[in-house]
């Protein structure tokens, strides 16, 4: 795990807009994990609507059209000041990718060395409470760099060990879709009962089916 390069390949998001805002690079500095963080060699990274919406700036309050209207060329009415998931201007260039499966290859101060070599999934949305906002959140690939590169850093406490026969690609489809579905089921207080899940063919819908089945 010591053969960590200084540079890596990845995709930069250079601003809100169309596909031209995505730039593939092979000279991106490999990040260094800070205290409480781990460096992850990315093995799989899912693409979901949050990545697309963030690129477009669709979360801006000025946007009234749907994402299909600007998927390739971008949207015209975006205000960069509130175009992110958290209403905070993004810092560019940004590496997107909120769904991350990988291997811990280096740890920062305060993180146990025995975590190196662990296969993990990263929680996509992470609580970062402040005095003024106890519910403040950050999203991988939005407020901080995500998994669309060979390496990324994440908080150690948000990187969960996985012991599973699923492939890296399969596991990379889990974090956002399953956490969204679980939140919906918890909010609806689903117990052992028969329910109808509409739109069940997508990532969140299919996750909701599996999580509902676990409840009996």
Feature locations, PLM:
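Glycine-rich beta-strand-centered segment in the early N-terminal region that forms part
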Residues: 29-45, 59-126
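Short, P/G- and charge-enriched loop/turn segments at secondary-structure junctions
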Residues: 87-93, 136-142, 148
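Nucleotide donor/acceptor-binding cores
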Residues: 8, 118, 192-194
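Mid-domain Rossmann-like dinucleotide-binding core that forms the NAD(H)/NADP(H) cofactor-binding site
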Residues: 166-216
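Glycine- and charge-enriched low-complexity intrinsically disordered segments
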Residues: 150-160, 166, 177
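Cytochrome P450 core scaffold surrounding the K-helix E-X-X-R motif
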Residues: 50-55, 130-131
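Short, Lys/Arg- and Gly-enriched loop/turn segments at beta-strand edges
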Residues: 127-138
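A structural motif shared across PLP-dependent enzymes of the aminotransferase-like
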Residues: 127-128, 142-156
């Amino acid at each position: 795990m010591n053969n960590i390069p200084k540079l890596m390949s990845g995709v930069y998001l250079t601003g809100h807009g169309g596909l031209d805002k995505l730039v593939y690079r092979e000279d991106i500095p490999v990040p260094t994990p800070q205290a409480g963080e781990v460096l992850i060699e990315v093995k799989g990274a899912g693409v979901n609507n949050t990545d697309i919406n963030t690129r477009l700036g669709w979360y801006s309050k000025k946007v009234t059209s749907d994402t299909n209207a600007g998927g390739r060329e971008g949207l015209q009415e975006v205000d960069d000041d509130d175009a992110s998931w958290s209403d905070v201007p993004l810092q560019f260039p940004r590496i997107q990718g909120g769904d991350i499966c990988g291997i811990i290859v280096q740890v920062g101060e305060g993180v146990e060395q025995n975590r190196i070599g662990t296969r993990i999934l990263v929680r996509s949305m992470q609580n970062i409470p402040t005095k003024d906002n106890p519910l403040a959140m950050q999203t991988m690939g939005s407020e901080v760099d995500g998994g669309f590169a060979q390496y990324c850093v994440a908080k150690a406490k948000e990187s969960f060990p996985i012991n599973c026969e699923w492939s890296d690609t399969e596991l990379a489809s889990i974090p956002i879709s399953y956490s969204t579905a679980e939140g919906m089921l918890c909010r609806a207080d689903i117990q052992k009962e028969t329910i109808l899940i509409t739109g069940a063919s997508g990532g969140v819908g299919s996750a909701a089916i599996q999580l509902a089945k676990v409840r009996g």
